[in-house]
Amino acid sequence: EYTGPHDRPLRKYPEVAIINGTLGPTGGIVQTPGVSESQKGYTVTSSSSWGNGGTDTRAGWCAFDEGKSTTTYKIWQSGNYYTTTTPGLYNRSPAQSHTADGVNYEGEWIKLELPRKINISAIEINAAAYSSLTGHVGGRPYEGAILGSNDDSTWSLLKSFSGGLSWATTTVAEGGGRVTLTPDTNTTNKYRYIMLVVNKIQGSRSSVDINEIKYYGHEEGSGSLDTTLKSVY
């Protein structure tokens, strides 16, 4: 009896931590675009990143390191492109902008390129408290969108959110807060590029600050790897 091919089991992506990537320049300056990194088939890019360089790098890849890097803060911090009001409004000029399904989404962004297409089931975002720097929690997303693409050009909406998110309290080491989003648009499609766009932040900060992002989903089925052959009597 032959069955298959099947989609593979639900997994976290990236499947491996992206650790000790490219360090930013010294001097506490904004990098536009942000410091990028490619490891083990994954590439992380962002619209901007900030940090004092060296071990104080706060590049996009830090949001996928599972806290295992030797950098000091282990967070992605964008440039200072938001007002310090509550919520913080996006004010970069010219704005970073992506169109998905006919709707324009503005905001700083962080993008993961995967080695294979996946169907996204859930998105986990962890805020960015660290040690005594609990004020970074104010840089967590308040309004934005999750987008998917297969050519890094044409984008589709997976999930939009506005009016704030319901954050569960976590330990400071975990970022101080966690939210899980479930796609509700284009839910059956598979994508190779996944992007978080942040239009507003919670407030009292001028940057997006994120400890960790985890995508959960299924890879495309593979006839060579995902088939089952059974003897039938």
Segments the model singles out, each with a brief description of its role:
Residues 44-46:
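Autoprocessing Asn-cyclization modules and mimics
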Residues 157-169:
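Solvent-exposed serine/threonine-rich low-complexity stretches and specific carbohydrate-binding patches
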Residues 168-176:
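Solvent-exposed, conformationally flexible loop/turn segments
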Residues 1-33, 49-61, 67-159, 177-229, ...:
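Aromatic, loop-rich ligand-recognition surfaces of beta-strand-rich domains
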